């Protein structure tokens, strides 16, 4: 069924896209066994769903999946099952469809206060290594962790009139939304971090800015998140995590009266009005003008 899915839907898909389909299928096979589609039952489906919630990657010391992540995994399973069912005219009821999922309160990831941002940025410059470059880059761009950790040399332009990074989909990283594709000016410690990471990448002859998180087919954001958040908790209150820099960037831009359309373009957030979807968007110079104002 998985081979059929790749055969019919694989064209134009990145390795990362295919991995997002393969991973839950391989997990399912390890838990339920490889058997004819007709032999899978509703009990099997619920067993796998519960395993995703409670046991996923415990051996790797990763946290259990959230409901949204479990649903994404089950969507992949449903996609593979439904395609095989349709193409082979099996006329089977899909036991993985319409499952009930646990209700979970969304995790609060508060914006990091400016004083703690300044503290972390100072420590990043003091430690001056690749892990701290990644934190510094995120702190003054508001990039998502996966976006920053997966950057390649070709995504950094320091010679432009406005130095910037390019966020786009690659084989190792897919974008969260269509609006995630963007150019983000480099200011403050983010500019310092990008220079450092680019120099190291050139010296080590690697295409990635942060190769420690790109040793596999896809960017290992989980590894980055665990290590970087652990370090941050040693220096600022534990409720503040890496993603809090992204929330803080939104607040920092508000404080300098940045127009909402510019905020959305900087962060790759969904457009708040239909009108914002027209045209080419703001110039780098316009984005840069507001980002310079938020440097601490």
Show which residues each predicted segment covers.
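N-terminal DNA-binding recognition helix of tyrosine site-specific recombinases/integrases
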Residues: 24-27, 35-40, 57-97, 144-146
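Catalytic-site neighborhood detector that most strongly recognizes the C-terminal catalytic loop/helix
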Residues: 107, 111, 191, 215-216, ...
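Active-site/catalytic core of tyrosine-dependent DNA strand-transfer enzymes
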Residues: 170, 187-238
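Short, charged phosphate-coordinating catalytic segments
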Residues: 82-94, 138-162, 260-262
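C-terminal catalytic core of tyrosine-transesterase DNA break-rejoin enzymes
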Residues: 136, 140, 147, 223, ...
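Conserved tyrosine-mediated DNA breakage-rejoining catalytic core shared by Y-recombinases
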Residues: 150-195, 273
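Short, aromatic/basic-rich helix-turn unit that serves as a nucleic-acid recognition element
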Residues: 1-24, 37
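Basic, Lys/Arg- and aromatic-enriched nucleic-acid-binding interface segment
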Residues: 64-67, 71-75, 91, 97-151, ...
